[in-house]
UniProtKB/Swiss-Prot annotation:
It comes from the Bacteria. The lineage of its organism: Bacteria, Bacillati, Bacillota, Bacilli, Bacillales. This is ATP synthase epsilon chain. GO terms for cellular component: plasma membrane; proton-transporting ATP synthase complex. InterPro entries: ATP_F1_dsu/esu_C_sf, ATP_synth_F1_dsu/esu, ATP_synth_F1_dsu/esu_N, ATP_synth_F1_esu_C, ATPsynth_dsu/esu_N. It is found in: Cell membrane. PANTHER family: ATP SYNTHASE DELTA/EPSILON CHAIN, ATP SYNTHASE EPSILON CHAIN, CHLOROPLASTIC. Belongs to the ATPase epsilon chain family. It is a peripheral membrane protein. One of its GO terms (molecular function) is proton-transporting ATP synthase activity, rotational mechanism. It comes from Shouchella clausii (strain KSM-K16) (Alkalihalobacillus clausii). Residues 81-110 are annotated as: Disordered. NCBIfam families: ATP_synt_epsi (TIGR01216), PRK00571.1-3 (NF001846), PRK13446.1 (NF009980).
Amino acid sequence: MATIQVSVITPDGAVYEGDAELVVVKTVEGELGIKAKHIPLVSPLAVGPARFIKEGKEEQVAVSSGFVEVRPDHVSILAEAAERPEQIDTERARKAKERAEQRLASEHVDRKRAEAALQRAITRMDVAKHKGA
């Protein structure tokens, strides 16, 4: 199967470079699957995992919003923050999840910020499960 080049870039530099048969990202409109020769597009990303599948194996990167730019031969994910599974501190993510849940239980809270923090923590914990995969 044909592959497409993939780059995940943050303000701190490249987090992932490789090629994949299928790239799946979470956009603000829902999940988007991308294969080689996809039509060009740019879409805002939601917090979620970016998945890269090649030869039946899947790699993931936790993405904290940004944009995806698709060209027929390359996918660029420009993220505010992104982490590979081995970079994620699962204990820190678990504590962030607990704090976000506590804030959401409070009456006087910026719900949008607390929900975003909760989603980031859940995404990081889910992606961390792919360490060594």
